[in-house]
């Protein structure tokens, strides 16, 4: 099943009645053929649905209102086949709440030089009509993506596909509930933020849930369920045979981890939550035999299922990871929540070890993860605990984070290169080693100047284009650190953005 089967993107063609009935028929036929071609290309993750040609203000308004009210519709593509006077789009655009992609293309690829007459030129006026439509969108400060290119070409289809994935991620976030088991880690600034503004701007609804409530679900988990999940662990992951010895402490720790996973999944499903956070200083009543350490293995596996996760109460990362996972569906290389841990200064190959105490998603593993039990001496409960151990794939990727700047949210994106790490025999955790682009000095320096977190959401498959589209839809700031970044220019960008986002509130 396609992960995006529940969604549609609507295609609306712009024209007018000035050119006569034959033109109206031709526009409709061409539009149908284009939409069928887009769907049959095999390049688009979301079905395109042709919603007809709009020839008047009332028709525009009707189709955009319908888009707003259709839960399956996650975005709208507009294309002007003929000249379509843009004042007729004003009322509809004022009401459109779904993401907008303006496709500047043409039914025919090339000009038929020997046969083109005035009728042909009047019919095929995308060069004319799309500029008119673009003007009114800009005049109205309508945020949208503009894709320019022939509709059958690979690059055009790729840009539409990127937009569709972002629209799906955006739609998913509009009813996103994040559950915080406990509060944020004390005295940490960057994981905090304005939850009211986050819901207004990005759709995130963040609720506190006392760990005592989670423990009630934990108590209800049957031993048979736990035994079955432990058997699944042993089937899916490499492990020492001794780990299956039920008389050992190590087996008991695996069993405890399985019960924690079942309890967290149960409460998330009961509440309809799409993500959660934990805090190693809030693990429930010590008098009840609940969590003996942070539920690291549970967090790893739940991330792989698609639940957002943030450590130490980091609800913004939990929400963002869920969006990353949705956008990443059907792409091959995987994604994870990660944390900057340790620097490795090695000249041009200077890098950052990405890890966490336990919670790294196995979707990015280079090989089959290994189930192990080791001591974790941090937080309110210091104990042996189960986890999946692996290193990440080698290759390029992109990592992102959202920070609260006080007057706005800032999305920070950094291109990275994951490289092969040396063995870590004394550090039994999942990890990745990457070089932030353009190098550690500039990449890390720019990230710090932007106020970036130590937590981020990483994907091998997503690129900065996805995040640019996301920021455009959300109406938030985005800064991109890449191979061309210099500290001098990046500082200027941050300063200009500071002024822009203060003045922009007066324009909206």
Predicted regions and their residues:
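C-terminal catalytic subdomain
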Residues: 300-431
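Long, internal scaffold/assembly segments composed of regular secondary structure
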Residues: 231-232, 236-330
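Short beta-strand segments enriched in small/hydrophobic residues
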Residues: 3-26, 175-184
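Extended hydrophobic packing segments that form well-structured cores
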Residues: 379-508
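Short catalytic helix/loop segments, enriched in acidic residues and glycine
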Residues: 25-41
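Cap/lid and interdomain-hinge subdomains that line or gate substrate/regulatory clefts
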Residues: 45-48, 104, 109-244
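Structural motif
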Residues: 52-66, 158
């Amino acid at each position: 099943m396609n992960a995006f089967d529940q969604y549609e993107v609507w295609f609306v063609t712009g024209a007018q009645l000035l050119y006569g009935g034959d033109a109206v028929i031709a526009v409709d036929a061409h539009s149908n053929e284009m939409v069928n071609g887009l769907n049959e290309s095999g390049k688009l993750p979301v079905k395109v649905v042709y919603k007809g040609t709009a020839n008047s203000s009332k028709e525009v308004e009707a189709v955009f209102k319908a888009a707003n009210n259709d839960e399956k519709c996650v975005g709208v593509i507009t294309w002007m086949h003929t000249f379509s006077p843009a004042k007729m789009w004003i009322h509809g655009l004022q009401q459109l709440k779904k993401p907008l992609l303006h496709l500047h293309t043409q039914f025919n690829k090339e000009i038929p030089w020997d046969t083109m007459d005035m009728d042909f030129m009047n019919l095929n006026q995308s060069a004319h009509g799309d500029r008119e439509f673009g003007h009114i969108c800009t005049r109205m400060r309508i945020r949208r993506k503009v894709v320019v290119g022939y509709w059958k070409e690979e690059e055009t289809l790729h840009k539409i596909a990127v937009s569709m994935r972002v629209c799906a991620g955006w739609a998913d976030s509009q009813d996103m509930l994040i559950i915080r088991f406990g509060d944020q880690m004390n005295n940490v600034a960057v994981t905090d933020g304005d939850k009211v503004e986050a819901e207004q701007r990005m759709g995130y609804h963040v609720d506190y849930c006392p760990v005592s409530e989670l423990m009630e679900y934990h108590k209800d988990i049957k031993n048979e369920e736990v035994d079955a999940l432990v058997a699944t662990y042993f089937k899916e992951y490499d492990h020492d045979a001794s780990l299956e010895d039920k008389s050992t402490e190590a087996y008991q720790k695996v069993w405890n981890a399985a019960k924690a996973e079942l309890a967290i999944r149960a409460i998330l499903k009961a509440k309809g939550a799409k993500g959660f956070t934990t805090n190693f200083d809030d693990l429930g009543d010590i008098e009840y035999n609940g969590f003996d350490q942070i539920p690291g293995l549970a967090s790893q596996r739940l991330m792989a299922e698609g639940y957002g996760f943030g450590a130490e109460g980091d609800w913004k990362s939990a929400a963002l990871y869920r969006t990353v996972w949705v956008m990443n569906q059907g792409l091959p290389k995987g994604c994870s929540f990660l944390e900057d841990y340790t620097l490795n200064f090695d000249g041009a190959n200077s890098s950052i070890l990405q890890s966490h105490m336990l919670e790294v998603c196995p979707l990015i593993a280079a090989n089959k993860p290994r189930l192990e039990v080791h001591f974790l001496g941090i937080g309110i409960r210091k104990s042996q605990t189960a986890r999946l151990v692996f290193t990440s794939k080698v290759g390029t990727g992109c990592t992102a984070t959202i920070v609260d700047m006080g007057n706005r949210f800032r999305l920070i994106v950094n291109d990275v290169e994951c490289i092969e790490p040396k063995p870590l025999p004394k550090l039994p955790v999942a990890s990745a080693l990457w070089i932030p682009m353009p190098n550690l000095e500039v990449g890390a320096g720019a990230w710090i100047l932007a106020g970036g977190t130590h937590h981020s959401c990483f994907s091998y498959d997503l690129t900065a284009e996805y995040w640019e589209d996301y920021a455009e839809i959300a109406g938030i700031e985005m800064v991109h650190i890449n191979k061309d970044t210099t500290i001098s220019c990046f500082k200027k960008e941050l300063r200009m953005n500071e002024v822009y986002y203060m003045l922009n509130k007066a324009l909206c």
